[in-house]
Amino acid sequence: MTKVFALGWLLKINLMKTLYSLRRFYHVETPFNTTVGVGGRDIESTGFAWWSGNARLINVSGKLLGAHVAHAGIMVFWTGAMTLFEVAHFVPEKPLYEQGFILIPHLATLGWGVGPGGEIFNTYPYFVVGVVHLISSAVLGFGGLYHSLIGPDTLEESFPFFGYDWRDKNKMTTILGIHLVLLGIGAFLLVIKALFIGGVYDTWAPGGGDVRFVSNPTLNPLVIFGYVLKSPFGGDGWIVSVNNMEDLVGGHVWIGIICIAGGIWHILTKPFAWARRAFVWSGEAYLSYSLGALSIMGLTASNFVWYNNTAYPSEFYGPTGPEASQAQAFTFLVRDQRLGANVASSQGPTGLGKYLMRSPSGEIIFGGETMRFWDLRAPWVEPLRGPNGLDLNKIKNDIQPWQERRAAEYMTHAPLGSLNSVGGVATEINSVNYVSPRSWLTTSHSFLGFFLFIGHLWHAGRARAAAAGFEKGINRENEPVLSMRPLD
């Protein structure tokens, strides 16, 4: 065996190691050397330890770019891989919401591979989307590795357009403007898909939903901004109350215009004096602003997916809570009406209508426990309404088989648990081995939105403290561990 000369390694082996597998490479150990700075990313030069992640890259824009591009690659890789995973596990005979999918429902909502009634007839578009994302992730991954390991540490000298100084207020608002333009283009991509490229899935299309072109989007600002100015409480529902594709696509037209116009404004102008005074201008401050914005998006998405069955069709995501409840009342009404019950006059145990009743304002609504969800609007029940709530003549003569099937399916796939509850408390899920994608998406976005908000507060506090000249973090000069001997 060739003898390796390395100071002290033989002594260490003799005293501490007994296994050959442990001895074999002991002489090539690389102890932590605080005198060697790794590209300006060690604790001495940056003030941040390795676990602070991108904080070490605050002043090395090239490496920070690499970290962000690599992160984008990871996200896109997950998207592609998970889409292919869902395609591989897809069972045509089962609804999407019974298969635990969260990506194919989004693609189906965009009108790809789906037909009348929300039936998936072609999974090839989903395969293509997955593969395109995988290829994109490889490109992003290579870019991330290049900028992290090979590219210039800073961009300011080599590529001035992409370089920046966190305190350069004009450059920061220019970057903000570029982001806004890109977001506006993203909003218009949905508009283009809905108007020109195959259309989108509309759960309100006659007969139980279908893919259609949205040829006449709502552009009336009173309608679009009326959603924004609505109360978020009760039946008003803020923007979450959008209930037709014309308003939804029209909203994207307005958002696209506003984002692009705002982006151009921020690119061409410099911040006003009041803005320069009002905001903190540092990397950590921008991080806190971003986290706050993401928090709002996450919490809004959480409410949207839970309550809205237009942007998130129940054919793909499963019914909303009120929808499953009303579906149960409707299913038993259909059953008992066939058995001869007079659904208009039958009384329940409380003396109120068992199947149908009047609301305080006189509307005919479903009776029983589901009365609390009287204001539900869903595609399978709307054809049965008249000028004053449910139409008794339609209930007796016009119920279609597709409405019965859909209600029975939704009844047994409630997002929160059994609707055969006691005192309004959900007892157990009403189906076997089932968790609604609405529940998954709602709770995940709620948690993410909450913790992003906590991150916003944390980084905003640190940024404000730094701007005011306070000490960031805790003074650790007197911690006992600093006076202890090294482990080895």
UniProtKB/Swiss-Prot annotation:
[CaMn4O5] cluster binds at residue 382. Gene3D superfamilies: photosystem ii from thermosynechococcus elongatus. Binds multiple chlorophylls and provides some of the ligands for the Ca-4Mn-5O cluster of the oxygen-evolving complex. It may also provide a ligand for a Cl- that is required for oxygen evolution. PSII binds additional chlorophylls, carotenoids and specific lipids. The lineage of its organism: Eukaryota, Rhodophyta, Bangiophyceae, Bangiales, Bangiaceae. GO terms for biological process: photosynthetic electron transport in photosystem II. Belongs to the PsbB/PsbC family. PsbC subfamily. It is a multi-pass membrane protein. Keywords: Chlorophyll, Chloroplast, Chromophore, Manganese, Membrane, Metal-binding, Photosynthesis, Photosystem II, Plastid, Thylakoid, Transmembrane, Transmembrane helix. This is Photosystem II CP43 reaction center protein. The chain crosses the membrane at residues 84-108, 149-170, 193-215, 270-290, 306-327, 462-486. One of its GO terms (molecular function) is chlorophyll binding. PSII is composed of 1 copy each of membrane proteins PsbA, PsbB, PsbC, PsbD, PsbE, PsbF, PsbH, PsbI, PsbJ, PsbK, PsbL, PsbM, PsbT, PsbX, PsbY, PsbZ, Psb30/Ycf12, at least 3 peripheral proteins of the oxygen-evolving complex and a large number of cofactors. It forms dimeric complexes. One of the components of the core complex of photosystem II (PSII). It binds chlorophyll and helps catalyze the primary light-induced photochemical processes of PSII. PSII is a light-driven water:plastoquinone oxidoreductase, using light energy to abstract electrons from H(2)O, generating O(2) and a proton gradient subsequently used for ATP formation. GO terms for cellular component: chloroplast thylakoid membrane; photosystem II. The gene is psbC. Residues 1-29 form a propeptide. It is found in: Plastid, Chloroplast thylakoid membrane. HAMAP family: PSII_PsbC_CP43.
